[in-house]
From Swiss-Prot:
Protein name: UvrABC system protein B
Compartment(s): Cytoplasm
GO molecular function: ATP binding; ATP hydrolysis activity; DNA binding; excinuclease ABC activity
Residues that hold ATP according to the record: 38-45
Classification via PANTHER family: UVRABC SYSTEM PROTEIN B
The organism's place on the tree of life at top rank: Bacteria
Family, per entry: Belongs to the UvrB family.
Annotated Helicase ATP-binding domain residues: 25-412
Organism in which the protein naturally occurs: Clostridium acetobutylicum (strain ATCC 824 / DSM 792 / JCM 1419 / IAM 19013 / LMG 5710 / NBRC 13948 / NRRL B-527 / VKM B-1787 / 2291 / W)
Matches recorded under Pfam families: Helicase_C (PF00271), ResIII (PF04851), UVR (PF02151), UvrB (PF12344), UvrB_inter (PF17757)
Domain Helicase C-terminal intervals: 429-595
Length: 666
């Protein structure tokens, strides 16, 4: 059985040791609710990793979007290379939910494009939870949506062991029931192929390796894991478990039982609609439901089978659906990252889903049981919590009111202080800002400017560009990958000034920023609330030279509280540094390109530029060359020659880089 063991050259410093000890003691004392209140740049992820190592519990980390989840997953994989760190987010590249607009009599069919890579990662996560305890699953809020029943998922899995008596046809029938497809030509994830007494199975959660089962009569003679591309054996196994190809896979006897229940519900609902003279709706419902039933009888599933999940699971009306949380053992630990943003999302999920389903049920497109194909209500989510740690620089009242223990992490390992804040009048603010920008650029640093409106942000960007300042503007229409590219361009000096409205989101921890300017700081509202201001001030906490200028003609209550809290933290930090002889140092952070999972999260091709990801480290470069050569061969095999040529060029670039490094060493 694996255990969590951190792989890091660093040890906890500053406030980290006491925060770790405080949370760990709370977990051991069975505290259900705790909060880690950590300032920006205090190493909250490293603290979380140390807590996980000390308590040795399977852990679910929930983030508020796919990209932040991907970044956390990447960090946890670095900390725990020998454990199973998984990624679980919505697998839709594109999703148009089923809906009906009564005013225009428009039915909108469900339309979705599933990202195969993310589907694989989801299967990898659920299967890992059944196989070991040293598992961390980093998920987005989509983890509270209904998923197949874990008991059925486990029951449907097939355990294979050498020396076991297993008839070949029995294995094949089981694979089909688990929704694996037989495909002798295109051997991909979720398929199997057969040649005599040899069965090759490509597990749903696997990336590039498959399982070969060799039979001798009715006995399993050998089990091997092999590389799908080369065919080479990776290792010989004594035992393996194959999990279903779909989280909604259901045994044939369960389907027959479910069909009976669907037919009973259909009869009841038809009587109801007919009694209300809704003849069109009754006819529509009868036709659609009978078609679904026929599909289930013929092939074991139907389009939109998730709408019958309550009946398939044998749940009562209104009973919460099974979710990823149910795949965890009872003693699991949960972290909610950036809880001040994530929890409101969790609370809002159910309401949005319910309002859309009302018209589908009312107008005869779905049976009432479709209501129970839904995300968890917030109180149901709370009931599923075993032990939880909220993580935020600015926790909301919910977290603070519920927490039995609040561990504060104010000291940064780098000794960096919360920035000094200056309030200046709005009169002549743009000229004043221009002067400050010029001085900051001369010192080799970058600037963040936050405005209240899109128009002002655009106008300011154009104005600064006209004055010869390399300025870019970040707005809400930019997708996550483009956003990450802009951040990279700011870090590398392609741009000196970044203007935006809401600069609080993930990924804006830019060490090169030495000035954060907040325009219209005295305008009350969401973007100028105490929490928003503290978060924005935190963007300046990665550089020892950094400071904040608030432009406003009065100090609002929110400004006063944010300034006061920043001063309190700064005082604690200065005292700690003086006591321990620490000189604040700007964070040195390599400029990395978009990580692979982030690209998968956004459904883009995986072969974007990785130049900055390549460090001048021969071991890393050698590893990348091997990975790219493998990708090149795989692409060529699939006749994707453009993609293959891309990887060929990358391999040549890396080999050149390797030679240059070797010359330097000589």
């Amino acid at each position: 059985m694996g255990t969590f063991k951190i792989n890091s050259a660093f040890k906890p410093t500053g406030d980290q040791p006491q925060a770790i000890a405080s949370i760990v003691n709370g977990i051991k004392n069975n505290n259900k609710w705790q909060t880690l209140l950590g300032v920006t740049g205090s190493g909250k992820t490293f603290t979380m990793a140390n807590i996980i190592e000390k308590v040795q519990k399977p852990t679910l980390v929930i983030a508020h979007n796919k990209t932040l989840a991907a970044q956390l997953c990447s960090e946890f994989r670095d900390f725990f290379p020998d454990s199973s760190v998984e990624y679980f987010v919505s697998y839709y590249d594109y999703y148009q939910p089923e809906a009906y607009v009564a005013q225009t009599d428009t039915y909108i069919e469900k339309d979705a494009s599933i990202n195969d890579e993310i589907d694989k990662l989801r299967h990898s996560a659920t299967s890992a939870l059944f196989e070991r305890r040293d598992v961390i699953v980093v998920a987005s809020v989509s983890c509270i949506y209904g998923l197949g029943n874990p008991e059925e998922y486990k029951k449907l899995s097939i355990s294979l062991r050498t020396g076991m008596n297993k008839d070949r046809d029995e294995i094949l029938e089981k694979l089909v029931e688990m929704q694996y497809e037989r495909n002798e030509i295109n051997f991909v994830r979720g398929t199997f192929k057969v040649k005599g007494d040899t069965i090759d199975i490509f597990p749903a959660g696997s990336t590039s390796s498959a399982i070969r089962v060799e039979l001798f009569g009715d006995e399993i003679d050998k089990i091997k894991e092999f590389d799908v591309l080369t065919g080479n054996t990776i290792k010989t196994l004594k035992h393996t478990v194959i999990f279903p190809a779909s989280h909604f896979a259901t045994s044939s006897d369960k389907i027959e039982e479910a069909i009976k229940q669907i037919e009973i519900e259909l009869e009841e609902r038809l009587r109801e609609l007919n009694s209300e003279d809704k003849l069109l709706e009754a006819q529509r419902l009868k036709q659609r439901t009978n078609f679904d039933i026929e599909m289930m009888r013929e092939v074991g599933y139907c389009t939109g089978i998730e709408n019958y999940s309550r009946i398939m699971d044998g749940r009562q009306k209104g009973e919460p659906p099974k979710t990823l949380i149910d795949y965890f053992p009872d003693d699991f630990l949960m972290f909610i990252d950036e809880s001040h943003v994530t929890l409101p999302q969790v609370k809002a999920m159910y309401g949005g889903d319910r309002s859309r389903k009302n018209s589908l049920v009312d107008y005869g497109f779905r049976l009432p049981s479709a209501y129970d194909n839904r995300p968890l209500k917030f109180d149901e989510f709370e009931e599923k919590i075993n032990q939880i740690v909220f993580v935020s620089a600015t926790p909301s009242n919910y977290e603070l009111d519920h927490s039995e223990n609040i561990a504060e992490q104010v000291i940064r390992p780098t000794g960096l202080l919360d920035p000094e804040i200056e309030v200046r009048p709005t009169k002549g603010q743009i000229d004043d800002l221009y002067s400050e920008i010029k001085n900051t650029i001369q010192n080799g640093f970058r600037i963040l400017v936050t405005t209240l409106t899109k128009k002002m942000a655009e106008d300011l960007t154009d104005y600064l560009k006209d004055l010869g300042i390399k300025t870019t503007y970040m707005h809400s229409d930019i997708d996550t990958l483009e956003r990450m590219k802009i951040i990279k361009d700011v870090r590398t000096g392609e741009f000196d000034v970044l203007v935006g409205i809401n600069l609080l989101r993930e990924g804006l921890d830019i060490p090169e920023v030495a000035l954060v300017a907040i325009l219209d700081a005295d305008k009350e509202g969401f973007l100028r609330s105490e929490r928003s201001l503290i978060q924005t001030i935190g963007r300046a906490a990665r550089n020892s030279e950094s400071r904040v200028i608030m432009y406003g003609d009065k100090i609002t209550d929110a400004m006063g509280k944010a300034i006061s809290e920043t001063k309190r933290r700064r005082k604690i930090q200065i005292e700690y540094n003086e006591k321990n002889g620490i000189k604040p140092t700007t964070i040195k952070k390599a400029v990395r390109d978009v990580i692979g999972i982030s690209e998968v999260a956004e459904g883009k091709t995986e072969y974007k530029s990785m130049d900055e990801a390549v460090k001048a480290d021969n071991k890393n470069i050698d590893k990348l060359i091997k990975e790219f050569e493998k990708e090149m061969k795989e692409a060529a095999k699939e006749l994707q020659f453009e993609k293959a040529a891309y990887f060929r060029d990358k391999v040549n670039e890396l080999k050149k880089k390797l030679n240059e490094n070797e010359e330097v060493i000589k």
